[in-house]
């Protein structure tokens, strides 16, 4: 019983405790909730108060900013209004000034018009008086006014011309004496310092033979060897009774040199047949190319002219195998360079420019038989192509009078060219005319389409033309020969007759392996 009571009491106590705890916790919770609500309300009230304060401050700031802007705008408007008023005032003042000036101009214009009328009236009166006076003078003197003017002008012109001619003659005489004296000194000094050998070139070369039996081997079976050599080189081989010698005849020194070297190699080798001849001619061409380059380099070194394009060096070397009226063109060019340089040093001109232009002045002659135009025009094109200066091109272009010299160096090159050419024994006219005729003959042949190369042989009595087989067939050869003959008759003067031989060759080459 006691146990049950105890349990009941415990249960009741626990229930009371739980209930009491519940109410206590509830009161505490309600108290905390009340505090939280009060705090939240305070925060909200404070936030409302703060936001109203901030809003009022922002509104106040905005009003102040607007007031500031309005004040600034009003100030700017006042300033602009003031400026506009000032500008309007200046415009009004200018208009008033212009109005006054316009009134003055109108007044002056009226005055000028009146004065002009008075002047015109006076001029009319003067003209009437002059006419009356002239009529009186003409009636008294018996001549018209135009005739009197003509007489006065004629007499005055005659007197002035006489005085001018006397003065000019005296000045010219004095200038010529001084110029002749100075030029003789300069030219004499230049010639004295320059001593160049000039060998008169011929059109034949003699090749020595070890024995006369070699002549038969050179001719070959049915003449095939000699024909092959003549066809490949364009040179005539003359084999006569001259002991142990063969004569090479041709107007082109380069071809003669190729033929000479090839023939000497064939003689030394001993094997002479068409295939070997072709091989030796090709080797000779390469050897002559090297020799030409050496000649050009030697000429540039001898004249102290540096920086020349390699192609111009090669063309300079070719001039060693060209002649002008029998004068070796390369040696002539070297001599012109030396003389022009010496004269330039004497008068204070550009020595390097004078030497360079003197050395290159005849460069066009290296290819003038291959290109159209004078050697001066060809030379100018070559120098432009290989980037020579305008001064050098101008100086070389004037040496034959085709262009007016604009520089002292151009005059010096022209003078040096004339000095070198005019030296006694330097040139021979007849050989040059003969060579030019042969060059013209080859030029006519090469002007036709389909012609590969041509050679003037037999002292110009025969022209041998090699044509391209793919361009000209057998039927067209006869027509080409007839046309070429007619053109030679029309354009060339020559003694006797010229044989036109056209060769069309087709080769088929295969190699057995």
Swiss-Prot record:
Determine the domain of life of the protein's source: Bacteria
Any one Gene Ontology biological process term? mRNA catabolic process
The record's EC number reads 3.1.-.-
Membrane spanning stretches: 3-23
Q: Where this protein primarily resides, as one coarse class? A: membrane
Q: Localized where?
A: Cell membrane
Gene Ontology cellular-component terms listed: plasma membrane
The entry lists its GO molecular-function terms as: RNA binding; RNA endonuclease activity
Q: How does it sit in the membrane?
A: Single-pass membrane protein
Q: Which residues form the HD domain?
A: 329-422
Q: Which UniProt keywords apply?
A: Cell membrane, Endonuclease, Hydrolase, Membrane, Nuclease, RNA-binding, Transmembrane, Transmembrane helix
- Residues covered by the KH domain: 203-266
Group of enzyme by EC:
hydrolase
| UniProt-listed HAMAP family | RNase_Y
Which family does the record claim for this protein? Belongs to the RNase Y family.
**PANTHER family cross-referenced by the UniProt entry:** RIBONUCLEASE Y
| Role of this protein | Endoribonuclease that initiates mRNA decay.
Q: What is this protein called?
A: Ribonuclease Y
């Amino acid at each position: 019983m006691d146990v049950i009571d105890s349990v009941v009491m415990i249960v009741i106590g626990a229930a009371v405790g739980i209930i009491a705890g519940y109410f206590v916790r509830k009161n505490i919770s309600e108290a905390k909730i009340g505090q939280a609500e009060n705090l939240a309300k305070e925060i909200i009230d404070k936030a409302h108060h703060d936001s109203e304060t901030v809003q009022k401050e922002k509104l106040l700031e905005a009003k102040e900013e607007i007031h500031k802007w309005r004040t600034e705008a009003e100030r700017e408007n006042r300033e602009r209004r003031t400026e506009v008023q000032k500008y309007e005032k200046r415009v009004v003042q200018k208009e008033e000034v212009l109005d006054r000036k316009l009134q003055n101009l109108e007044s002056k214009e009226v005055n000028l018009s009146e004065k002009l009328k008075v002047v015109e009236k006076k001029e009319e009166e003067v003209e009437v008086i002059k006419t009356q006076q002239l009529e009186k003078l003409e009636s008294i003197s018996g001549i018209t006014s135009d005739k009197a003017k003509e007489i006065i002008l004629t007499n005055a012109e005659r007197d002035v011309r006489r005085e001018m001619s006397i003065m000019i003659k005296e000045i010219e005489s004095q200038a010529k004496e001084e110029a002749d004296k100075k030029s003789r000194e300069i030219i004499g000094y230049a010639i004295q310092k320059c001593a160049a050998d000039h060998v008169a070139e011929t059109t034949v070369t003699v090749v020595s033979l070890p024995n006369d039996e070699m002549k038969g081997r050179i001719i070959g079976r049915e003449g095939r060897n000699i024909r092959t050599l003549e066809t490949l080189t364009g040179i005539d081989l003359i084999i006569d009774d001259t002991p142990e010698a063969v004569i090479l005849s041709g107007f082109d020194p380069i071809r003669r040199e190729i033929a000479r070297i090839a023939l000497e190699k064939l003689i030394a080798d001993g094997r002479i047949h068409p295939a070997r001849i072709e091989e030796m001619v090709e080797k000779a061409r390469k050897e002559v190319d090297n020799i030409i380059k050496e000649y050009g380099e030697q000429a540039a070194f001898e004249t102290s002219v540096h920086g020349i394009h390699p192609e111009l060096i090669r063309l300079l070397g070719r001039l060693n195998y060209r002649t002008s009226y029998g004068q070796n063109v390369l040696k002539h060019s070297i001599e012109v360079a030396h003389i022009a340089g010496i004269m330039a040093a004497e008068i204070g001109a550009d020595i390097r420019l004078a030497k360079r232009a003197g050395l290159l002045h005849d460069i066009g002659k290296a290819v003038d038989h291959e290109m159209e135009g004078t050697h001066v025009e060809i030379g100018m094109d070559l120098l432009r192509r290989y980037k020579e200066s305008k001064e050098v091109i101008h100086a070389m272009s004037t040496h034959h009078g085709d262009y007016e010299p604009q520089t002292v160096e151009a005059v010096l090159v022209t003078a040096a060219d004339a000095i070198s050419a005019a030296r006694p024994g330097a040139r021979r006219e007849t050989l040059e005319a003969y060579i030019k005729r042969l060059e013209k003959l080859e030029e006519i042949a090469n002007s036709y389409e389909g012609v590969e190369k041509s050679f003037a042989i037999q002292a110009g009595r025969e022209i041998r033309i090699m044509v391209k087989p793919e361009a000209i067939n057998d039927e067209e050869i006869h027509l080409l020969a007839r046309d070429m003959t007619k053109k030679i008759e029309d354009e060339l003067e020559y003694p006797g007759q010229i044989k036109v031989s056209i060769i069309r060759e087709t080769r088929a080459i295969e190699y057995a392996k």
